[in-house]
Amino acid sequence: MIGCLIAGCTRTLMSRKTYNHIQVVLRLCDVHLPSWKTVQSAKTQLQKMTHCKKYKSLSVIGNPMTTVSIQGLLKQELGNPIVAKYLDFYPENSKGENIYKLSQCEKWLHQYPRDLRAQMIRVGDQSFYIYEPAQIIDRNVVVPLYFYNKGNKLWAKVCKLNVLVLPSSLVELSISGDLNFYSSNMKDIMAEEFLKPYHEITFNDGRPLKSICRNELYEITPERTEIIKLPNPWRLKAQGRMIRHVPLSIYSDDTSGNLSKQWNKHISIFMSLAGLPPHISNQEYNTLFVATSNIATALELAAPVVEELNILSTSGFFTFDHSLQEDVLVLPVILMFLGDSPMHAEITSTLHPNVSLQPCRICKLKAKNKKDKATGTYVDNFIGRNTNGILVKPNLRSWIDTKKAAYHTWYLVQRGAPKTQVQSCISEFGVKDVLNQTIIHTIKENQDTKVTYNIRRLQDDSIEKLFNPFYELKGFDGHKDTPVEVLHVILLGIVKYLYRDLICGLTVDKKEELVARFQSFDISNLNIPSIKAKYLVQHYSSLVGKDFKIIIQAAPFVFFTIIEESRQKIWISLCHLCSLIFQTHISCLENYVANLNSFTQDFLIKLISSNAQWVNKPKFHILLHLSQSVARFGPASLFATEKFESYNGVVRQASIHSNRQSPSQDIANSFMNFSAIRYCLSGGNCISETNVSIVSPSYQVKNLLLKNPTIQNLLGLDSYIFKVKPRELKASAQTQTGSI
């Protein structure tokens, strides 16, 4: 373990040459390190003992990829004593109040389909499942449809069970099929009120209910009747074990694999556990690497990830849960996909916003041509109003329609339609499946290759593999589950545009005055060491997100004597809006969303009134949809990407120490080494070398992390969590609102 730590991980990776140099120097001091080969062998063995696995695959167009097993990563997380105790496995019904974590979001609470919700609760030694009849303490039989937390206790949303006695002495069980979480026909009951599960309920004459209902439950709506088989399929899969519901936040981005300015593009995929409170999940320690490639596109790289997620969300997997000290069945599902605007456009099969006549991935904002963008109708639509200036609800895109449009384009090509007709179809629907278009190009350029043969085979057997894999991802709606991300839309978008516009309009004297005002600005409440005033003014075109955070907070105090009144109004409105957007705690969601919409409209109207050419920047429009993202997921800080962006540096370090023969595999192996070391130092149980017993790290190994701030920092872990209990940490998170 000592040799592995010296060889480094994440940001401190060491080359073989440097390690050998240190080994020789320490040998002079009679300190003997294991050889480099021994260290690498130990890392490989440690991977096997800590559930680490990787999968090699070829993309549909033949690019090799290596993906770290999501199942292995989740086994580590639930077996990790540091992580498991903080995880939420049930959504929390906060009733729109005191929202600060993802487990309180509306999607997790009630917007998953039936088979992807939290499936069961345990009361005593009994397990109760959704869409199964259950008897409660007043002897009535109900059907739970949702399980959730409220006030640190488990609750259920249940509906009435209708029983029809048939002439054959059998019974027909039915429930209403048009019930949602907030329906007046739903009832809230505490978990302790459940008495008997489905298989123990008896009918009036003493016969077991399961023997006379044909194990069927009818869900009836005016339009259809659906037969639900009993018992819940997850009861059979769980085999008496607890089921852990684990939503995931997935992120993808491109970064350079070089330290130099020469661009060496690597597409990477990371994830984090949505059940962790933000104070924990925002630590680098809890960012999980999944895959990277310097040749495959984001959709190619995502294909094996989506495939594994679908398998896991269908069948689950067994692992040890450290918080329960027992084996559990894990049900992982996707909660959201994070990325910048170009990445979101690729994932949602929409056109790149900067050059498109349909620049929004969420709604159907459209201009017929470039000249149409200069019309009043388009400007009104851009800020969410009709031609009379009245606010209107946006015409939202449909994920199903997007998939249909992509397939329609493919079939046009297969029928030999001219290129102009295909391009016209893409423009009409605003849908461009990048993976499918790449496949079309590959077929045209390489008629007789092995890749083309494989594509033709898939067209007959598994045509869905020729399209965006996210179409098939269970529980994912590309247009709803790609929330408006504030780093790229607000800081690196709106604030950057307006600041550059401001600086370009200043004289030399005004710029000097601005520098002086920045220098005299009191930063005692900004939690930053200093303001680089000259840098902010002279290098305004090279600023990064943290610089714009400083600028937007200083703007009300340093800008207003050097700009005209019309710009002052825009900046005042933007400052009000940003002070709302960057709140990490929402006391009342309904009021917050209403205020957010109001401030957004105020800002956009003042902006467009000053210069309507801002409609050429799609990020001003996408701001309109931020309130929808907040209503679905909670405070914007919960889907911020800074923690993932900073992790790009770790990928870069791993790339530098790759042999460059197979970067995807080398980098994946490097992160698996880190994952194994992290898990072992955290005190997770390991599989013995003979694979027949479980071994726990010694207290000396655990103390390397628990009592050593340097090692904690090495792994990206804040030592604060060792000083407080989980409940105290959660309580403190509820009371903090955080500055920008």
Task: Identify the role of each PLM range.
Residues 206, 211-229, 235-251, 257-273, ...:
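Core catalytic machinery and nucleic-acid-binding channels of phosphodiester-processing enzymes
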Residues 31, 257-259, 278-281, 298, ...:
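Eukaryotic short linear interaction motifs
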Residues 1-64, 78-81, 90:
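N-terminal regions that are enriched for targeting/export leaders
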Residues 272-315:
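Compact, glycine/acidic-enriched structural inserts
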Residues 22, 253, 305, 360, ...:
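Short, conserved catalytic/metal-binding motifs centered on acidic residues
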Residues 43-228, 490-740:
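Terminal interaction-prone segments of large eukaryotic proteins
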Residues 261-265, 283-286, 348, 372-376, ...:
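Short coil/turn segments at secondary-structure boundaries
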Residues 314-547:
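Domain-level detector for long, ordered catalytic/regulatory cores in large eukaryotic signaling
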